[in-house]
C-alpha cells in the first residue's frame, strides 16, 4: 500500500511538473520592435527600436500566460541621426525623462486568429490599457540554439495624443502601429545561449 501511494505521488508530481507554467527570456538579438505611422498624410514610414528585454510566462496546459516587456526608447533608430534626435526629444518620446517603454500583460489568450495579449502600455510616463493581436505563436525546440524557445508576432495601434505625443499632427499621423516580433528562450537555457552568442 505504501509503495502504491508513493508511486501515485510520483505520477502526480510528474504530471504537475509537466503542466507547470514555464518562464522564457526575450532574446534581443532575435527580436525586433518597430513602429509605423503615416507621414504627411501620404506614405507610411516605419522606424525601429534596437533594444528590447523582458520575460514571458507560458502555461501549455491552459494555453495562457503573461508577458513583461521593456523597450529602450533611447535605442530608436530611423537611419538618420537628425531624426533620431527629434524622436528622442521632448515633443516625442522625451527619452531624457522617460528612457523606457513598458508593456505588462497579465492575460494572454491563445485561440487561433483570436489570440491576444491584454495589459498596460506605458509611454512617456502615461499608462493605458491595450490589447495586442498575436499571430504565429509557437513554442518549439530550436536545434540551432539547443534550447526550447517561444516566438510570435504582436501588434497594436495606439494614438500618440493619448501618450502626450500629439504634436505636429500635420506631419505625423495620430495613429501609430507598434509591431513586435520576438523570440524568447526558456529561462534555464538563456544564459548558455547568451554566452554562446557573445563568444561568436
List the model feature ranges, each with a label:
Residues 8-11, 111:
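Compositionally biased amphipathic helical and low-complexity segments enriched in hydrophobic
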Residues 10-18:
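Hydrophobic h-region of N-terminal signal peptides that target proteins for export
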Amino acid at each position: 500500500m505504501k509503495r502504491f501511494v508513493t508511486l501515485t505521488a510520483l505520477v502526480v508530481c510528474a504530471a504537475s511538473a509537466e503542466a507547470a507554467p514555464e518562464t522564457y527570456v526575450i532574446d534581443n538579438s532575435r527580436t525586433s520592435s518597430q513602429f509605423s505611422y503615416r507621414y504627411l498624410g501620404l506614405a507610411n514610414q516605419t522606424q525601429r527600436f534596437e533594444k528590447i528585454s523582458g520575460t514571458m510566462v507560458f502555461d501549455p496546459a491552459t494555453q495562457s500566460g503573461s508577458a513583461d516587456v521593456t523597450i529602450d526608447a533611447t535605442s530608436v533608430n530611423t537611419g538618420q541621426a537628425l531624426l533620431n534626435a527629434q524622436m528622442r526629444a521632448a515633443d516625442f518620446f522625451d527619452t531624457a525623462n522617460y528612457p523606457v517603454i513598458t508593456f505588462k500583460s497579465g492575460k494572454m489568450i491563445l485561440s487561433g486568429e483570436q489570440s491576444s495579449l491584454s495589459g498596460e502600455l506605458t509611454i512617456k510616463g502615461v499608462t493605458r490599457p491595450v490589447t495586442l493581436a498575436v499571430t504565429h505563436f509557437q513554442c518549439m525546440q530550436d536545434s540551432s540554439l539547443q534550447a526550447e524557445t517561444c516566438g510570435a508576432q504582436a501588434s497594436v495601434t495606439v494614438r500618440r495624443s493619448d501618450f502626450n505625443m500629439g504634436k505636429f499632427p500635420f506631419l505625423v499621423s495620430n495613429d501609430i502601429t507598434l509591431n513586435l516580433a520576438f523570440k524568447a528562450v526558456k529561462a534555464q537555457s538563456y544564459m548558455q545561449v547568451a554566452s554562446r552568442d557573445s563568444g561568436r
